Design a protein with these regions (language model features):
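Long, charge-dense
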Residues: 94-97
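Helix-hairpin-helix/helix-loop-helix acidic hairpins
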Residues: 111-147
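Catalytic cores of Mg2+-dependent Asp-rich isoprenoid enzymes
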Residues: 1-90, 101-105, 127-136, 146-158, ...
Length: 259
């Protein structure tokens, strides 16, 4: 068990303020696994914010590159620069898991510019390198060994998260969807639902210890079903359930282990 020091306390506070859904899942997890999850999720927040640190592309690129360098330092097993997130992250990640930071950072470069995705495969790859790699980091740190299964589940979660982020991305002059028509949105949401279904069909093969790493997907199915039935909710920014259903859903997933 990794002790909570000042760095991890700061990581937890960062996640609490910046990613309340993932914070809720960590607090629902056993005490002994909270520290590594807070370090991983704090890293994700810092990396996700890096492209938006400046309207000047060169500065934003430098911020993203900083995290690529951190990933390389951790992966190489050498000294890691002092930083309240990077320092505990280095204690949590194996060299192999740290190796994913480079592709995660590369994917985040999309946020710096205003180019659309080339095709559906490019969008899917973006989701896999962001949500997929993040969920694999968390689950693998907690004992998961089936990367393909975790990433399949994460794809569905990532599509749900992506659809919820559409209004903000559009407001920032980005082009997040290949087909923003109602039918196009519904079709994308259906691919997410299918991924969740496929992954959950193999639920029994995942180690129970890894459950907290998959809990951030507890709302995904409900959100995707909304997007299929009412695709206009995406542009309106109204995807999501009530606070009561949100809390009840998380409690159900934790108590039953049915991620």
């Amino acid at each position: 068990m990794i002790p909570f020091d000042d760095d991890l306390t700061a990581c937890a506070d960062l996640v609490r303020k910046g990613d309340p859904d993932r914070f809720a899942t960590v607090m629902a997890a056993p005490v002994e696994v909270r520290a590594p999850l807070f370090a991983i999720y704090a890293f994700n927040l810092e990396l996700a914010r890096a492209p938006w640190a400046s309207s000047e592309a060169m500065i934003a690129e430098m911020r993203v590159q900083w995290w690529r360098d951190v990933g390389e330092e951790i992966a190489s097993g050498g000294p890691v620069r002092r930083h309240f997130v990077a320092t505990p992250l280095a204690k949590v990640l194996t060299s192999e898991l740290a190796g994913h930071i480079d592709s995660m950072a590369e994917a985040r470069r999309w946020d710096i510019y205003r180019d659309p995705f080339e095709d559906e495969a490019a969008l899917a790859a973006h989701i896999d390198k962001t949500t997929g790699s993040l969920m694999w980091m968390a689950a693998a740190t907690l004992g998961a060994s089936d990367e393909a299964l975790v990433r399949r589940f994460a794809y569905g979660v990532g599509v749900a998260n992506w659809l919820r982020a559409i209004p903000k991305l559009v407001a920032e002059k980005r082009i997040p969807l290949l087909d923003g028509t109602p039918s196009g949105i519904s079709a994308l949401a259906k691919t997410g639902l299918e991924a969740l279904k496929e992954a959950r069909g193999q639920r029994a093969t995942l180690r129970k210890s890894a459950l907290p790493g998959l809990l951030p997907g507890w709302q995904a199915a409900a959100i995707l079903r909304q997007a299929v039935a009412e695709p206009q909710r995406v542009a309106e920014g109204t995807l999501g359930t009530s606070e009561f259903r949100r809390r009840a859903g998380l409690i159900y997933r934790v108590s039953t282990g049915r991620w």
